Curated annotation (Swiss-Prot):
InterPro entries: HisE (IPR008179), PRib-ATP_PPHydrolase-like (IPR021130)
Catalytic activity: 1-(5-phospho-beta-D-ribosyl)-ATP + H2O = 1-(5-phospho-beta-D-ribosyl)-5'-AMP + diphosphate + H(+)
GO biological process, one term: L-histidine biosynthetic process
Name of the protein this chain belongs to: Phosphoribosyl-ATP pyrophosphatase
Any one GO molecular-function label of the UniProt entry: ATP binding
Length: 112
């Protein structure tokens, strides 16, 4: 099993964000701001969906990695820590997805 995890990636992103290294994609993306980072996140989400629909496992793995990385960059820019997201997910365990959505005033989606 790989020892690399999201917390470690979050730490690397934080280090690079503060590095001032003009050769760091992370530093450049963060300095470009939320609009640029969110756009990249959206692009990676679409590419992940395309890979999933195509049932291309190799592409799905690669695009998922890109998606997670860009998601963590967006969280960094927004000042949201990964542990805050994990606490939210933890608070939802033990509840059905339908009940959780209803608690937020969202109608449940059809699975069809």
């Amino acid at each position: 099993m790989n020892e690399f995890d999201l917390s470690r990636l979050e730490g690397i992103i934080a280090e690079r964000a503060n590095s001032g290294d003009t050769q760091s994609w992370t530093a450049r993306l963060i300095s470009a701001g939320m609009d640029k980072a969110a756009k990249k996140l959206g692009e990676e989400a679409v590419e992940t969906v395309i890979a999933a629909v195509a049932r291309d496992k190799k592409a799905l793995i690669a695009e998922s990695a890109d998606l997670v990385y860009h998601w963590l960059v967006v969280l960094k820019i927004a000042g949201v820590r990964l542990d805050e997201v994990m606490l939210e997910l933890e608070s939802r365990t033990g509840r059905s997805g339908i009940a959780e959505k209803e608690s937020r005033g969202k109608p449940p989606e059809s699975a069809a």
